[in-house]
UniProtKB/Swiss-Prot annotation:
GO terms for biological process: regulation of translation; translation. It comes from Sphingopyxis alaskensis (strain DSM 13593 / LMG 18877 / RB2256). One of its GO terms (cellular component) is cytosolic large ribosomal subunit. Pfam families: Ribosomal_L1. InterPro entries: Ribosom_uL1_bac-type, Ribosomal_uL1, Ribosomal_uL1-like, Ribosomal_uL1/biogenesis, Ribosomal_uL1_3-a/b-sand, Ribosomal_uL1_CS. PANTHER family: 54S RIBOSOMAL PROTEIN L1, MITOCHONDRIAL (PTHR36427), LARGE RIBOSOMAL SUBUNIT PROTEIN UL1M (PTHR36427:SF3). Belongs to the universal ribosomal protein uL1 family. Binds directly to 23S rRNA. The L1 stalk is quite mobile in the ribosome, and is involved in E site tRNA release. This is Large ribosomal subunit protein uL1.
Length: 232
């Protein structure tokens, strides 16, 4: 086990593993507990009352964090002609067709979002085994297969994130850098939780949002009182 720093030891007693905190209190505590020498991310883990092995209990979608993510998201776009030019003008990092496919098959996958126009899906379809496991496969339900590539690129660069429930019913996401301050982090928290609540599937049974915890990239988890969450 790694040795605790003096600051970590001093803060260790501040976290009661069983205590439920209000959202504002939890965000403040996470920021106080951050000890890394870099600008850590506020991370959320939500335990949902769903079993994603059943199609009618899948939770997946996109949400725009009003204060952004604090990250530079690299975006690749499959498009030709006028759409390719629009994607580049909107800030896409890489735009192409067969050439982009070959580049990705060669292992160049350093992207946070992959977007495609509908007519390019014949090419993109060949990348299913390459992009699928990384969660990068363009999907019309997520707005990443679209004729409006410029809007999709701007959304990806402007704080839009994708979410998807994992096998055990948990959703993880980053809600921005701790340096954003408590007010902006709260705005991002509210937007994310609201999106998850609205994405409640028809097959969900019993209590939907069961547990919520916040932490910094390297810090301990702080439990949030779900009674404070609207619609949860």
């Amino acid at each position: 086990m790694a040795k605790l720093t003096k600051k970590q030891k001093a803060l260790e007693g501040k976290v009661d593993a069983q205590k439920l905190h209000g959202v504002d209190e939890a965000i403040k505590l996470v920021r106080e507990l951050a000890t890394a020498k870099f600008d850590e991310t506020l991370e959320i883990a939500m335990n949902l009352g769903v079993d994603p092995r059943h199609a009618d209990q899948m939770v997946r979608g996109v949400v725009t964090l009003p204060a952004g993510t604090g990250k530079d998201v690299k975006v690749a776009v499959f498009a030709r002609g006028d759409n390719a030019e629009k994607a580049l003008a909107a800030g896409a990092d890489k735009v192409g067709a067969e050439d982009l496919m070959e580049d990705m098959l060669a292992g160049n996958l350093d992207y946070g979002r992959v977007i495609a126009t509908p007519d390019m899906m014949g090419i993109v379809g060949r990348l299913g085994k390459t992009l699928g496991p990384k969660g990068l496969m363009p999907n019309p339900k997520l707005g990443t297969v679209t004729p409006n590539v410029a809007e999709a690129v701007k959304a990806a660069k402007g704080g839009q994130i994708e979410f998807r429930v994992e096998k055990v019913g948990i959703i993880h996401a980053g809600l921005g850098k701790l340096s954003f301050g408590e007010e902006k982090l709260r705005q991002n928290f509210d937007a994310f939780v609201d999106a998850i609540v609205k994405a409640k599937p028809a097959g969900a049974k019993g209590k939907y949002v069961r547990k919520v915890a916040l932490s910094s990239s390297m810090g301990p988890g702080v439990k949030v009182d779900t009674a404070e969450l609207t619609g949860a």
